[in-house]
């Protein structure tokens, strides 16, 4: 269901997305309609902390959830968005057909980063820095003409490209203690994905993959269906249920808007389902964007926003590409708190993290699984400050972000247990930082803080701050 808004009166009307025949839903008597909810408060923090949508879903349907593990990951992904001519395709031969063409006979284009040597580089980086997994996009046959052709079969999900030595990489990752993350781009052919699903998931289990990122770029097949129609919602649920049967975790992109089903199927670790970080390559997201999403998109479940972008100007890679992210570097650290997800990416290139190792330390340290959350201040479209307690320690983390205006965040430390001394490591915007003119200006300092006191922290235009708070006698 969508909401249509009258631009003059701001009145809202429900809009059920129909199928290609105009039918809004196929139902059998008797039937129950889904819950429809409104979250209303005169304090924006109440909206952020509300669990109403999640709690209206059925309890967990998976008896043994011990295999579901939150994770932090990097990936062969962003380098295809930077404008440096890298591509998902192994060859430029658009007549290649998955399962028919002998790809070993094709001429490689030399611009394919999902190759054995490069993936090993990512695995090494992940192992060195304690990152759990490595996503690899562009590993399988079918990318030569994948966008917009609407074929009955675009991809095969068990056929690696010749330069992607899957058995060698599988064993190398295992040796290094790193998990490879599967990628299933469907080119929006959900019908064919249903047909391949069991074979694809079995292939994953046979090769030590426990998690998959799915994608549905383009117009949906069955033709003229919509991303949020009844058919696609049923498809999405089927994928999650079948994934659970194989003990596979899912991060779905271009998926229907979430409605809290991750409570019932917690293997659905994350979804995109809104304008995410990849749009920093397509003109950039405005600073206010991530001050809105926690009030809207995230009420239905965690979002794979792909934070952690340190090089925000794409002209760094290609002078002809002027796209710039609406963020400072410090704000990217804060997003790990304000845009929480149990499957959280560090999206930038390893070499960019190596340029800023002190800032990258926060990404290495910040958890992805939380025991408690306290929203300290918030206004939609303007600012958010939140504190979260690590599920596996007594450490608290604070994230604060602002829109295109500078402001001073007031961080009330009353959430800290009394009777202890604490130190706060603060990653913040430098005084001259600005998302557009000086995005990489940041500073790091450690100060003593006390429960019940207020910490004032400057946030630059489009900026933010990320803080780790530890007991000084913590081991």
Question: Model-predicted segments: where are they?
Answer:
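Feature activates predominantly on carbohydrate-active enzymes
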Residues: 30-34, 39, 55-85, 92-105
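Flexible loop/turn segments at secondary-structure boundaries
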Residues: 45-46, 81-84, 126, 141-148, ...
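Active-site mouth loops of central-metabolism enzymes
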Residues: 80-94, 99-118, 183-196
